[in-house]
């Protein structure tokens, strides 16, 4: 798959990022991961991000990363394209990128470098180095310490033909508009704020109709129903799902830092696809919060295809 073919795929439909399965000892559980991917594939996501932020990329050892990406690529070979999360220092990100390409990933999601303060010129050099290390398509994730502006992204687009996507996790509307207007069709644009559904209508109005869904991990039918309602401008259905599900969901998710991942793993367990515990420094939901989420999911009804 060429980077441009991947860009076309990422320009339409709903995207998601499966959680990574761990066993009771906290080790990668490939059998559980295969079961998860096989369950999610028929629901119709356009692409899946393996070992992304919600997939706890930041907690995986290098050997585990290879297992996760290989398992995802092999399992989804005939069903849905897999993009691999990559990040860390520039040299680490390049190593992960080359490994993901070797294992057959169709593209990369370049996560922000961790903790280290850097100028945005330095961040741009980091992105360029990763792009030039591989031939597959790369999506850059503007979030936290990565805050690339339209000028830098335009420069990167000229230098890196395989930089084909921009994912926004900042929520800076002025910046998003300037990037979208400047870069036009050069990129695919993805909404990437946590619980992106809450912002989906606003981002669609900005020319960003595609987003990645965390709740697809445990209420995939509800996630697809919401996406289709956004796509057809069914404002009544959008409003009802936001009121009935997404706002109460946020009330739980926002109780502790890191719950954006923890609540997804809790939801997967409630749905019958237990992915095990989150790894430290994240913490799992309390028993009370777990029951609150279970009651909320029950209101959404069966999640059959």
UniProtKB/Swiss-Prot annotation:
Disulphide bridges, residue numbers: none
CDD domains on file: KDGDH
Enzyme class: lyase
EC number of the protein: 4.2.1.41
Domain of life: Bacteria
Pathway(s) the chain acts in: Carbohydrate acid metabolism; D-glucarate degradation; 2,5-dioxopentanoate from D-glucarate: step 2/2
SUPFAM superfamilies referenced in this protein's UniProt entry, alphabetically: Aldolase
Keyword Lyase: yes
Key words of the record: Lyase
InterPro entries: Aldolase_TIM, DapA-like, Dehydro-deoxyglucarate_dehyd
Pfam families: DHDPS (PF00701)
Molecular function (Gene Ontology), one example: 4-hydroxy-tetrahydrodipicolinate synthase activity
Reactions it catalyzes: 5-dehydro-4-deoxy-D-glucarate + H(+) = 2,5-dioxopentanoate + CO2 + H2O
Listed GO biological process terms: D-glucarate catabolic process
HAMAP family referenced in this protein's UniProt entry, alphabetically: KDGDH
Family: Belongs to the DapA family.
Full protein name: Probable 5-dehydro-4-deoxyglucarate dehydratase
Species per Swiss-Prot/TrEMBL record: Pseudomonas entomophila (strain L48)
UniProt lineage: Bacteria, Pseudomonadati, Pseudomonadota, Gammaproteobacteria, Pseudomonadales
């Amino acid at each position: 798959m060429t980077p441009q073919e991947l860009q076309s795929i990422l320009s339409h439909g709903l995207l998601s990022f499966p959680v990574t399965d761990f066993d009771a000892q906290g080790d990668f559980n490939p059998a559980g991961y295969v079961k998860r991917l096989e369950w999610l594939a028929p629901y119709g996501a356009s692409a899946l991000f393996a070992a992304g932020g919600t997939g706890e990329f930041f907690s995986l050892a290098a050997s585990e990363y290879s297992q996760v990406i290989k398992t995802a690529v092999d399992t989804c070979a005939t069903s849905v394209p897999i993009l691999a999360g990559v990040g860390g220092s520039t040299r680490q990100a390049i190593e992960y990128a080359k490994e993901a390409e070797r294992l057959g990933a169709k593209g990369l999601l370049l996560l922000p470098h961790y903790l280290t303060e850097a100028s945005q010129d330095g961040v741009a050099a980091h992105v360029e180095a990763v792009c030039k290390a591989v031939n597959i398509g790369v999506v850059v994730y503007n979030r936290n310490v990565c805050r690339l502006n339209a000028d830098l992204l335009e420069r990167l687009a000229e230098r890196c033909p395989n930089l084909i996507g921009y994912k926004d996790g900042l929520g800076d509307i002025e910046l998003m508009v300037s990037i979208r207007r400047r870069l036009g069709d050069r990129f695919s644009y993805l909404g990437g704020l946590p619980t992106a559904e809450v912002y989906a209508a606003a981002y669609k109005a900005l020319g960003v109709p595609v987003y990645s869904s965390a709740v697809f991990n445990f209420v995939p039918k509800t996630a697809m129903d919401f996406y289709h309602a956004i796509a057809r401008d069914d404002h009544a259905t959008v409003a009802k799902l936001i009121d009935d599900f997404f706002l109460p969901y946020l009330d739980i998710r926002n109780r502790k830092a890191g719950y954006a991942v923890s609540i997804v793993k809790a939801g997967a367990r409630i749905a019958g696809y237990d992915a095990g515990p989150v790894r430290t420094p994240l913490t799992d939901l309390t028993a009370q919060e777990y029951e609150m989420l279970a009651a909320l999911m029950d209101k959404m009804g069966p999640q059959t295809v």
